Amino acid sequence: MRFPLFHSRNGLRFYLLRGIALSILLVLAVFAGNVWQVYRTGNQTLPAAATADAAVVLGAAAWNKQPSPVFLERINHAIALYQSHRVGKIVFTGGTPKKGYMTEAEVGRRYALKQGIPAKNILFENTSRNTYENLRNIKPILRANSVDSIIIVSDPYHFARAQAIARDLDLNAEVSATPTTRFDAREKKGRFLFQESYLLFLYQFESWGDRIWDWITRNG
């Protein structure tokens, strides 16, 4: 069977342009879906009766051995969950961008100890550099300490990506947003929403690529 359109320059150009247009539309549709997912997930609230073995505080910047305002909000929220007996432990995550500086996890732990949280109820990993590593690196620590369920603590728009990662890592996770956030201003909120939608898209693209490659290597 012959396909005349493919045997002319105009026919080939038509199919090429149509393929590019469809690809762009697909990317835009996925991105729009991500924006909605990030927004919807960011407006979810933790059920009043929800409890877990531990609260996991996703890392954020630390300055001169002190938590940044964003990190402080996350730490205080995890402490509130602990003090209200909704979690039994607090897990801090996060490394350092520069050698010689105190890690985010160590800054969080230090602050929590000063607030009266017993050292035996604080766990941490201090080598991660991003959200995926935060959650991946705590997995063996959770297992070693018989922690079967967690509540992830972060800013609202961070949760769509955090949930996707937790799901891929087979973590039994709920999410709980900080009651206040430094991203409340409309401009900052919009920027954070766009940024997280973009990062979720990149994570999905990489995750789908890995799955396709795994399928090819298994069946090739």
Q: What is each model feature region?
A:
Residues R2-A50, T217-G220:
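N-terminal membrane-anchoring alpha-helices
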Residues F3-L5, G33-F194:
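A structural signal for short, hydrophobic/glycine-enriched beta-strand patches
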Residues W36, R186-I216:
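A transmembrane-helix-recognition feature enriched in membrane-embedded lipid enzymes
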